[in-house]
Swiss-Prot record:
It is found in: Endoplasmic reticulum membrane; Microsome membrane. Pathway: Alkaloid biosynthesis; (S)-reticuline biosynthesis; (S)-reticuline from (S)-norcoclaurine: step 3/4. It is a single-pass membrane protein. It comes from Eschscholzia californica. InterPro entries: Cyt_P450 (IPR001128), Cyt_P450_CS (IPR017972), Cyt_P450_E_grp-I (IPR002401), Cyt_P450_sf (IPR036396). The gene is CYP80B2. It is an enzyme of class 1 (oxidoreductase). This is (S)-N-methylcoclaurine 3'-hydroxylase isozyme 2. PROSITE patterns: CYTOCHROME_P450. CDD domains: CYP76-like (cd11073).
């Protein structure tokens, strides 16, 4: 009760201070809906803020302002506004706004995702850029990804005629791909009931939910020290559970490297240990590599499978391309340059269903001007990648799934075309983008080449529900269940 009383007093004090002083000095903010006293626009937002932001952009334009408690939030919903934030003013707007739930000791300051652009951040990104995600490393590991896809097909062949929650199969496959890239071994046994894959996924998704759940301290920063609803504590517990999954493997490797004659495996763990990274840095880095490399990619592939299920003509066209180029052998990553329709299908999936609907929020290091509006120092900035991908001013028939729009098009998602930014852009662009592209394309191609599938209980594709579950990543709700069968 004492904590609640102190917190209530903090809300009242911070609100009074804002009413007295908070609105002065920034008379040229972007327009936006009128805020209510104290809470601002908080109560005007629902369960799908990305969709609401896109609607607000139709009224207020490329960039608009929301008051979230005492915090000022600027939202960009067009490619031109995104370009200003992610390119023109990339350095000034490169700081990270960290959700209170994620401010766990030892994590934020060692995080590629959440820390500011410090020397530690630069060193960690350098390790990723020069060791893990180089073209040479990606190509050298292609056979591992292809082998795991073959194992996935073998598993699904054993499930013919049964309902399969496809995202769990995808997730387990991706975890083992990353496990081999990082530890040179599988993490879980695909399909085994006690393999731990589901537990790992639940930890990750719960953390993503907590990051986007309502936390009064995000809107009234004076409450930050109290952790009123235990969200920071729960994130810390999730991290502890995740670290335990690979902790034994990490400790075993440390001991092995101390033995004379140790033969380096040349995997990412060896690189981390040889680079002198401490346990906090290694755990934070592995957490984000597994999290970003599995959860976001799994969601994207599930969305691709959903769209292909709803659009059998597109599936047939993709399958025909694979048959023409690849023939009877298994598709390989080296085939990708000759598979333009596969590339277009991946792009179209990322346009309609970006893995992170709202790019992780940035924070202004200095006051600057965007599109003739003032963006104050410490303002929170959000870029609505979901809304930009569906902007009718940019895309013809934007709600229709049509890979053809990307055939003979130079538009790409590598951070140079601001109409398609599922992985962000600028210095905060996802460092794992090159390998994520390989994951997504390979698994989609493997499904289409090797499997036929239908919906359970004779359900028509016309009745397939395509709803979104909003979080830091965008999941399909309800999950996609299919009944696999081998292709004749």
């Amino acid at each position: 009760m004492e904590v609640v009383t102190v917190a209530l007093i903090a809300v009242i004090i911070s609100s009074i201070l804002y009413l007295l002083f908070g609105s002065s000095g920034h008379k040229n903010l972007p327009p936006g809906p009128k805020p209510w006293p104290i809470v601002g626009n908080l109560l005007q937002l629902g369960e799908k803020p990305h969709a609401q932001f896109a609607e607000l952009a139709q009224t207020y334009g490329d960039i608009f302002t929301l008051k979230m408690g005492t915090e000022t939030v600027v939202v960009a919903s067009t490619s031109s506004a995104a370009s200003e934030i992610l390119k023109t003013h990339d350095r000034i707007l490169s700081a990270r706004y960290v959700f209170q739930s994620f401010r766990v000791k030892g994590h934020v300051e060692n995080s590629i995702v959440w820390s500011d652009c410090t020397e530690t951040w630069k060193n960690l990104r350098k390790v990723c850029r020069t060791e893990l995600f180089t073209q040479k490393m990606i190509e050298s590991q292609a056979h591992v990804r292809e082998k795991k896809c073959e194992e996935m097909v073998e598993y699904l062949m054993k499930k013919q005629g049964e309902e399969v929650k496809i995202v769990e199969v995808i997730f387990g496959t991706l975890v083992n791909i990353f496990g081999n890239l990082i530890f040179s071994q599988n993490i879980f046994e695909l399909g085994x009931p006690n393999s731990g894959s589901s537990e790992f996924k639940e930890y990750l998704w719960r953390m993503l939910e907590l990051g986007n759940s309502t936390n009064p301290a995000d809107y009234f920063p004076m409450l930050g020290k109290f952790d009123l609803f235990g969200q920071r504590k729960e994130v810390a517990e999730c991290l502890k559970g995740i670290y335990a999954i690979w902790g034994a493997m990490l400790q075993e490797r440390k001991l092995a490297k101390k033995v004379d004659g140790y033969q380096s495996k040349n995997d990412f763990v060896d690189v981390c240990l040889d680079s002198g990274l401490n346990d906090y840095q290694i755990n934070a880095l592995l957490m984000e590599l597994f999290g970003a490399g599995t959860e976001t990619s799994a969601s994207t592939i599930e969305w691709a499978m959903t769209e292909l299920t709803k659009n059998p003509k597109i599936t047939a066209k993709l399958r025909s391309e694979l048959q023409t180029v690849v023939g009877e052998r298994s598709v390989k990553e080296s085939d990708f340059p000759n598979l333009p329709y596969l590339e277009a299908t991946v792009k179209e999936t990322l346009r309609l269903h970006p893995p992170t609907p709202l790019l992780l929020p940035r924070r202004a290091l200095e006051t600057c001007t965007i599109l003739n509006y003032t963006i104050p120092k410490d303002c929170q900035i959000m870029v609505n990648a979901w809304g930009i991908g569906r902007d009718p001013k940019t895309w013809i028939d934007p709600l229709t799934f049509s890979p053809e729009r990307f055939l003979n098009s130079s538009v790409d998602f590598r951070g140079n075309d601001f109409s398609l930014i599922p992985f962000g852009a600028g210095r905060r662009i996802c460092p794992g983008l090159p390998i994520a592209n390989q994951f997504i394309a390979l698994l989609v191609a493997t499904f289409v080449q090797n499997l036929d599938w239908c919906l359970p209980n004779g359900m028509s594709v016309d009745h397939l529900i395509v709803e979104e579950k909003f979080g830091l990543t965008l999941q399909k709700e309800p999950p996609l269940f299919i009944v696999p069968k081998s292709r004749v």
